Regions:
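Active-site helix of classical SDR
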Residues: 120, 156, 164
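Active-site loop-to-helix junction immediately N-terminal to the catalytic Tyr of the SDR YXXXK motif
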Residues: 100, 146-154, 166
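Residue(s) in the substrate-gating loop at a strand-loop-helix junction
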Residues: 140
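Conserved glycine-rich cofactor-binding loop
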Residues: 10-12
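Alpha-helical segment proximal to the catalytic Tyr-Lys
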Residues: 125, 169
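Substrate-binding pocket helix/loop in short-chain dehydrogenase/reductase
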Residues: 96-97, 101-109
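Conserved glycine-rich Rossmann-like NAD(P)H-binding loop of the short-chain dehydrogenase/reductase
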Residues: 24-41
Length: 169
């Protein structure tokens, strides 16, 4: 019975990842910024639990260090461990370098880069204790090919590659 922690489970890749791990027999802890009674959160719970495994959900903004810490701690309280982390939460910002404000720049760095580091740091002791811990940080083709008009997103996705290499040392 593996336990997988996934961020951004209310839609898209995060929901798909949760479904596939549940299908493989893993219990899934998920977070997003959505309220627990939101239809998208109910969909997360349903796709996981229909596979005969347990789900846990806690609303958490991954840019808020305390909310992220609470999510990790509640996951461990619920399941007793974490075997795998899929740090998926993020968003694209369609702005060129010249139009990107300081505020948008820093928010993008926080959401699409720093949140991955925070989550890795928080989960590291549990992954090591697992003995088979796996950490997946979601990136995209923007890490390898900059797309015009996606300035801050391109930068953060490229930086995730460096973050992964540094964490692997």
């Amino acid at each position: 019975d593996k336990v997988v922690l996934v961020t951004g489970v209310s839609s898209g890749i995060g929901l798909g990842v949760a479904k596939e791990f549940a299908r493989a027999g893993a219990h899934v802890a998920g977070c997003s910024r959505k309220s627990p009674d939101d239809a998208s959160v109910q969909a997360f719970r349903e796709v996981v639990e229909q596979e005969g495994v347990r789900s846990f959900y806690r609303p958490a903004d991954v840019t808020d260090a305390e909310e992220l810490k609470g999510f990790v701690e509640d996951t461990v309280r619920t399941f007793g461990r974490i075997d795998m982390v899929v740090s998926n939460a993020g968003m694209n910002v369609f702005e060129g370098a010249e139009g990107c404000t300081e505020e948008r720049w820093h928010y993008n760095l926080d959401l699409n880069l720093a949140s991955h580091w925070r989550l890795a740091r928080l989960c590291k002791p549990y992954l090591e204790k697992s003995g088979e811990g796996v950490l997946l940080l979601m990136t995209s083709n923007h890490a390898f090919s900059s797309i015009p008009g996606c300035f801050p997103y391109n930068v953060t996705k490229t930086a995730i590659t460096g973050l992964v290499r540094s964490l692997a040392i």
